[in-house]
Amino acid sequence: MAFLNKLAAPALRQLVSQSRAYAAVSHVSPNGTSFALTEDQLQLQELARKFTREEIIPVAAQYDKSGEYPWPIIKKAWELGLMNNHIPADIGGLDLDVFTTCLSAEELAYGCTGIMTALEASGLGQTPVILSGNKEQKKKYLGRLLEEPLVAAYCVTEPGAGSDVSGIKTRAEKKGDEWVINGQKMWITNGGVANWYFVLARTNPDPKCPPSKAFTGFIVERDSPGLTPGRKELNMGQRASDTRGITFEDVRVPKENVLIGEGAGFKIAMGTFDKTRPPVAAGAVGLAQRCLDEALKYALERKTFGVPIAYHQAVQFMLADMAIGVETSRLAWRLSAWEIDQGRRNSYYASIAKCHAADMANKIASDAVQIFGGNGFNSEYPVEKLMRDAKIYQIYEGTSQIQRLIISRNMYEAAKGQA
């Protein structure tokens, strides 16, 4: 079965619909958790793998050097159905579960995490609407992403509010049937190319108001008067991704674009991460797997003292540790995705997966450069880019320190509940 765009493959939608009931429980065995893949999942995984080898890897270095947004890749991925496949079926999407979309994310990240982030960030922007939008909002804003290759963006981070979301200063004031937004956002992925944004703004000016009631989520059109993207940031890695600041000056948003209602924004924003952190972890695994493959290949070819360096125990142990990191990280994202697909809150497992995969990706990338020696420090070899690309995984969608904070709080809450 070829995963084609839903407009070109009505038969695919019918087949996915028929198999959805089975897919929803495909990871459950009589003895507990099972990660056996369905035929549909294997075919999507293979499609993403083929697309990565043929379309992404050959041009990844070019986009890294130019910093251009990979629109040609985005359009091809959209045509094949490698984008937006988590959009609900009643809107016309495939409504694939988190586990299945993570399979695709890992394969795409193997080729270039900058390009994968450009694809995945659109999913991050869409998720608040998928989780909390009403029928009209979903049809209007998710529907257009199925009609043509457009992307969305998640607009929350600010110059003074990253991990501390409660520090957001962007404000929205209600005036008649509209809300007027003023403020500045920072480090917004897809900031300059998005068709629309999910925006979190403070709607209760009382500094004593708890975050759970102080913020509201809005859908904001890119062409809204007063909305101005800044320059594209020149980042260390993942340069194919478009990252910018966004300025809001008296941006008027109709009341129809409020998600759920006033004061519900913080819950929406945080709930989004339970869905999106597993794909981020899967992306880190894709990068780590690429590092391991490149390092192993090089170690078998490069000779010192008359033998391939792979024969030296020091290198063997490094490769073994890299394999351990890849496999444990893969298991972690699979468990976190499986949990949310079972309808259970997965914050604990999602944070473990995101934190562990990010840390392992950075260590594995560093070890890959070490195995390459002087060549690893040169941009003509792939591991130099991989090491630069890896760092952001410890930062975006919640730093590794924030993930550890979430994990520890979950542990404390569980311990108190058992006392």
UniProtKB/Swiss-Prot annotation:
Species of the source: Drosophila melanogaster (Fruit fly)
Enzyme nomenclature, EC number: 1.3.8.7
PROSITE patterns for this protein: ACYL_COA_DH_1, ACYL_COA_DH_2
Binding residue positions for FAD: 154-163, 187-189, 302-304, 312-313, 370-374, 398-401
Location of this chain's protein in the cell: Mitochondrion matrix; Cytoplasm, Cytosol
GO biological process terms, semicolon-separated: fatty acid beta-oxidation; medium-chain fatty acid catabolic process
Modified residues (Phosphoserine): 347
Effect of residue 347 to A: Prevents phosphorylation by Pink1. Does not rescue climbing and flight defects in Pink1 mutants
Name the UniProt record assigns to this protein: Medium-chain specific acyl-CoA dehydrogenase, mitochondrial
